Structure formats: C-alpha cells, structure tokens
Amino acid sequence: MPNNPQDKPTVLKDPRYLEVTYSTTRAPVGEYPAMLARHLMETAYKKTGKLLDIGSGRGDFLDAFSHLGYEVSGVDISPLSAAAADTYTLKTCNLECEPLPFNENEFDFIFSKSVIEHLHTPYNLVSGAYRVLKPGGVAVIMTPSWAHTYWGPFYIDHTHVTPYTIPSLADVLQIAGFENISSRYFYQLPWVWRHSSLLPIIRLFSALPLSYRPYENARWPDSFNKLIRFSKEVMLLAVCQKPSR
C-alpha cells in the first residue's frame, strides 16, 4: 500500500466529486460568496489587486471577487474546475504534493476556503501560498472548526482528513513564515458579521438539539435550516501576512 499521501488515489481528482458533492442542486450558489467576498475585502484585504483562490472548485468565489474588481486566478485538483478557464486563469494541481503553478511573488492576496482540511499535510499548500504571495501580501485561510464539528458534521464531506483548531491553524501558518497571524472562530451567518452583539444568542441557539440538513434528513425551510446548521458548524478564519522586504 502507498505510504505517502501523494501516492494514494484520491476522489478529489474525479470530476464527479464536484458534480456530486457540490452540485448546484445540493449546494446552490446563492448570495453567500458575494457577501463573504465583500466582507473580506472590507475587513482583511482592504483593497483590490491580484487574488489567487486555492481550491477554487466551481468558481463561485472567483466570480464574487471578480465582481468586486479583483484580478482573479484559481487552482484546484479537479479537472472540472479548470473547465471554466475560458473566463478566468484556472490551473489544475495536486495541492497535496505539487507546487502551485504560478510565479513567485505574483499575487497580492490569497483566498482558500474549505480546502486545507482535505489534505493529509497542509505544508505544501501554505508554503506554496507563501511563495506566490507578494511581500506584504495578505492570505485568508478558512476551514471547519474541529471544536464545533468533531461530533459528526466534520465528516459530512467524506474527503475531510485533517481537522484544525484555532492554535493549530495559526501554528501551520507561522511555520510557513507568515506573520501578523489572526486565527478565530467565524460564523457563516452574514447578519452576525454586522451585529456581533447577537453572538451570545447564536451560541445559545446552537445548543438546542435541533437536526438539520445535510447532516440529518430534517424538513425545515431552507432559511431556518441554514440558521441551525451555521450556528453549529462554525468555521475558523485565519488572516496572515507575508513579511515585507
């Protein structure tokens, strides 16, 4: 049996992975990518520039950042992602073991959401992000919070293999050479971003024993299902910077 992660077969390379797991029926695009992109522009990036989406998938966030004025490129392990290359610069790469197919110091910003947990080791991704980021550039890494998902939701996607906590995600980035690292919990409920005083209520609500899709076959309306799900399935959001020259 292969001992190295790069030697192991992975379903992530199969076009059917995106078609099934992130089908527009199961995961409609909606307004969330645009709302998150704007939030990150205002709170993390602070300006526009060249942005690389590592693990760009269907291209939802490429569209969102492009509409805000960013010059976007994407990279993903799935050949289905590269099928949208007629719109954006999109390349395929095994993020587990291959170097990112971009030049050193090429991008002002890095964005990577729900990717690093799919990798057996994070260092190829984060060291690659460091290499292609310009000095002073900012990277945003998002991944499920193990503290909030260990009881089951982490494995809703069967390809999740490496969980993270606030300190472990920060350590990974520091080892790669990043500085000014902030790692924190992040609720995927846009109205909470604007009204942080509501967080205690959300935390109390999350403790209620309510089922939700897709973890269980609950029959709530979509809006209430999202409230239940994203009060419980909290993300980690790390913002860091490559040192200036």
Residues covered by each model-derived region:
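A short hydrophobic/small-residue beta-strand
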Residues: V72, A139-V140
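Short N-terminal helix/helix-N-cap motif within the alpha/beta-hydrolase-1
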Residues: L119-N124, W151
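Short, glycine-/aromatic-enriched active-site segment of Class I SAM-dependent methyltransferases
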Residues: I141-T162
